[in-house]
Amino acid sequence: FNIILIMNHLLTTRMEISEIASQSKEIHQWIVEKRRTIHRHPELMYEEFETSKLVQNTLKELKIPYKKDIAITGVVGTIGNGNAPCIALRADMDALPIHEETDIDFKSEIDGKMHACGHDCHTAMLLGAARVLKENEHKINGTIKLIFQPAEEGGAGGKMMREQGVLLEPKVQQIFALHVAGTIPVGTLASKEGTLLAATSSIKILVKGKGGHAAAPHHTNDPVVTGSKIVVELQTLVSRELNPLEPGVISITMANAGSAFNVIPSTMELQGTIRSLTIEGVSNLQKRVKEVAQSIALANRCEAEVSFPGNDYPPTINDAGCWQLGKSAAKEILGEENLIEMPDPIMGGEDFAYYTEEVPGCFSFLGVGNPDIDAIYDVHHPMFKVDETALSLGTAIHVNTALKALENLN
């Protein structure tokens, strides 16, 4: 009986905050090198084969058991005793089809592809957490899943990972993620309880008309003029049909038509995005986009084929208890003065929402901005940079969050 008590005490001996911070800082350069390797070789959604291999090889070196090829390139490592309680930490791995314009030594080696959303940082920080947690596995009473997922950037990799059972066996009870943010100072963390990020949808409108010579527009049904009217009129859906107190966005971001200056083309293609704080709001806007586009096309003797390709992401909603826990864990690493309680949601979207539809969770932003090194740009910008001092801080926050969550669940 005494031996059992002693063993239970050893299993539940909590790592001190100073230990978490120092052990994370000790491997800072290791984390940075992982990040830079991934940054040099960006891979788009569902093509993260080399990144996945790097994750697998690292977990193998750390003697962490893992499952691979989940959602094509996803990897899930497991630390702990394999029993309940179980929490998960998640990182995404995919890059963006953006040509990098920074001057960093380790910039993308692949033209037209860049880690402009910080997923290289997310993967490296979680690998850092894996190393620290594995070295202290004897202090873990429960199970920690490390979810490395593909295709956050529009591919709904989180949805596929969820459908393939990453939240089961053992069942995940809480899930946490960090996302770097270039517009808040390095060493700060921002989030809120409740709705944090919007539900999203893509838009594709193909306007079909009748082409002809530009000097004889009366013999054509001009899809360019018609498409332009559609773009303008869609903005009135937000300004005149939505409740002014209900956030919503319709942005047309791509317009393609024609190949010669003196020819009216027969088609014009429009693409864009819809954002709302509810999936019902997205559905309502989709309905009205279709009605408006088709009506304007008909009035101009054209046709409009309207579709919403890809995946409609649900809103990302932070569980109140998970945010309080995450905030407490971050405060112990960063200091209370470096926590930002966001007053409002933002209209970006995240497929982390697919996990929090199933289990309570919390998604937070980790500041990586620093004007001294020109790290002033937001994500999805070709000049996006990060202050890498944030990486070991992110690792420490992951570790502390995981241990506190298991402690509370126990």
Each PLM stretch: what is its role?
Residues 1-13:
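N-terminal amphipathic/basic-hydrophobic helices that include classical n-h-c signal peptides
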Residues 10-115, 124-141:
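Acidic/His- and Gly-rich active-site-bordering loop/insert found
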Residues 76, 96-98, 103-114, 121, ...:
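Histidine/acidic-residue-rich, glycine-tolerant segments that coordinate divalent metal ions
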Residues 80, 92-94, 149, 206-210, ...:
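Solvent-exposed residues in well-ordered beta-strands and their adjoining turns
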Residues 88-90, 99, 203-205, 363-368:
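Non-cysteine beta-strand/loop elements that form the S-adenosyl-L-methionine
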Residues 128-136, 168, 299, 356-358:
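Alpha-helix C-terminal capping segments
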